[in-house]
From Swiss-Prot:
Monomer. It comes from the Eukaryota. It comes from Penicillium roqueforti (strain FM164). GO terms for biological process: indole alkaloid biosynthetic process. The lineage of its organism: Eukaryota, Fungi, Dikarya, Ascomycota, Pezizomycotina. This is Fumigaclavine B O-acetyltransferase ifgI. Pathway: Alkaloid biosynthesis; ergot alkaloid biosynthesis. InterPro entries: CAT-like_dom_sf, Plant_Fungal_Acyltransferase, Tri101-like_N. Its EC number is 2.3.1.205.
Length: 484
């Protein structure tokens, strides 16, 4: 985000491939001292914008810049006008009345606009209208405050947005501390270090599978056939049990039969993570629901991979802009030819998964792990060079597949500190999804009676597919509801 003399911040190559949409984070605080909290928020946001004036800006498109077309930048106002980025709204009822949804079976199916009234901006703004960088809305309930932060995805990614919330918490909890450094200068130096040396070189790899013409995101229709977003809560012990079974298959590579394995034994990864295994299980279950069959011809998924810790640059770790590259995995569907034999997991619960299905999930998890392992600094430089070499930067974006995974589980949202008046973050939520097949792993929340945090996951699908998904045997088992 290098700042020029005319208060313009040029967005990076990675910013340009992000979805042209707005994302809303909603933080809930249970407090009866809402008036004092609101005044702290107002003072905190004022302080934050002084060290990060980028937040006051709006996005514009430069028709031509340095021989490239349609490069986007942020225009920062140099006057005191148009500096209000916080609005507040009073609701004369308890918080749960506004955050409730429609019960369907065993999960909460949220109507696609059920939380939008809590957000300061819609998810899509026409290109003919002004495009702000970020806005905040303080929703004052009789028993709580819900702080909504809506940000442009082409300026920040999920991790960068969480860092902004952490900075805001610091500004709110103690306005009298030593003044913060001018963060925009730090971001300027970080971007220079991260994206330096991309011009006049050739990409080392082919990126046409994961990057292509920028896909259009259309508003979600609000009829009976529209998309819905459902929040699933998966049991951590069940995920660990499934991970154990997949790891056993991986360890005993001979379980991969020649006619069913697609990864040579020599190329198997050294380990599988819980993220790999849950991604594979959800991808398989959703694809089965969509195809209405136990088997399907092909599975095509993409995943946003946070590159901050993968490119060996300290400047990247605190960078607020987009730092996610797009992983693309297209693989044949399962072939269940073996006996209908179920494998038992450890402890007392039987996992409703057959031998061939376990092999397929392990194979899929191995492919995901191998793809992630290969996304290093060399890959990052190649990807950035590919984007930078495009003549028209508006024509390249992340290719969305049937299933699009993102993980924000690493975000320390529940550890944010806004001060004693606010207390702890009671709940974190998102506005509804815009893309069919969107799967987001939410920040982990560890309660006092859990050794391992459960997995909260947002899934966006047509309502009929979500209804079928919550009835799937493997999904029910992963949620710990197989006995109901």
């Amino acid at each position: 985000m290098s700042t020029s003399f005319d208060h313009s911040v040029i967005l990076s190559p990675l910013d340009h491939i992000a979805p042209q949409a707005y994302v809303s984070y909603l933080l809930s605080f249970q407090t009866a001292n809402s008036t004092h909290c609101l005044s702290l928020l107002e003072a905190g946001i004022t302080r934050l914008t002084k060290v990060l004036p980028l937040l006051l800006g709006h996005i514009v498109v430069n028709p031509e810049l340095d021989g490239k077309y349609n490069i986007q930048s942020v225009q920062i106002p140099c006057t005191k006008e148009d500096r209000t980025i916080l609005v507040h709204k009073h609701h004369p009822f308890p918080m749960e009345s506004a955050l409730g949804g429609v019960q369907s079976g065993m999960s909460m199916l949220e109507t696609s606009d059920s939380k939008q009234h809590l957000c300061p901006l819609p998810p899509l703004i026409p290109s003919t209208e002004r495009q702000p960088v970020i806005r905040f809305q303080a929703n004052i309930f009789t028993d709580a405050i819900v702080l909504a932060m809506t940000f442009s995805h082409i300026v920040f990614d999920g991790t960068g947005a969480a860092k902004i919330l952490a900075l805001l918490g610091r500004c709110c909890r103690d306005p009298s501390v030593t003044p913060l450094p001018l963060i925009i200068d730090e971001q300027d130096r970080a971007q220079s270090a991260i994206f330096a040396g991309l011009a006049d070189t050739s990409p080392a790899q082919d990126h046409t599978a994961e990057l292509g013409p920028a896909p259009a995101i259309h508003p979600v229709p609000l009829d009976a056939a529209s998309l819905r977003t459902c929040r699933f809560e998966f049991n951590s012990e069940r995920i660990l049990q499934l991970k154990y079974q997949c790891s056993q298959v991986l360890k005993n590579a001979c379980m991969f039969q020649p006619n069913s394995a697609s990864i040579p034994v020599a190329d198997l990864p050294p380990f599988l993570s819980s993220n790999d295994v849950l991604t594979s299980a959800l991808a398989d279950a959703i694809q089965r629901v969509k195809s209405q069959s136990k088997t399907y011809d092909c599975l095509d998924l993409c995943m946003a991979v946070n590159m901050r810790g993968r490119i060996e640059l300290s400047a990247a770790r605190e960078f607020l802009g987009n730092m996610a590259c797009n992983l693309r995995l297209k693989t044949p569907g399962p072939e269940y030819t073996g006996p209908e034999q179920c494998l038992s997991c450890r402890k007392t619960h039987d996992c409703p998964i057959q031998t061939d299905q376990l092999r397929f999930l392990t194979d899929l998890a191995c492919k995901v792990r191998n793809k992630v392992r290969n996304m290093d600094r060399k890959y990052f430089q190649s990807c950035m060079t590919y984007i930078a070499n495009q003549k028209d930067w508006s024509q390249t974006g992340m290719i969305f597949t049937d299933l699009a995974f993102s993980s924000w589980r690493h975000l320390d949202i529940y550890g944010l500190d806004f001060g004693d008046s606010f207390g702890i973050v009671h709940n974190f939520d998102l506005s509804f999804g815009l893309i069919e097949g969107d799967v987001i792993f939410l920040p982990k929340r560890l309660t006092c009676d859990q050794k391992e945090a459960g997995w909260d996951v947002h899934i966006t699908l047509p309502a009929k597919d979500l209804e079928a998904l919550v009835k799937d045997d493997l999904i029910r088992w992963l949620m710990g509801r197989d006995g109901e």
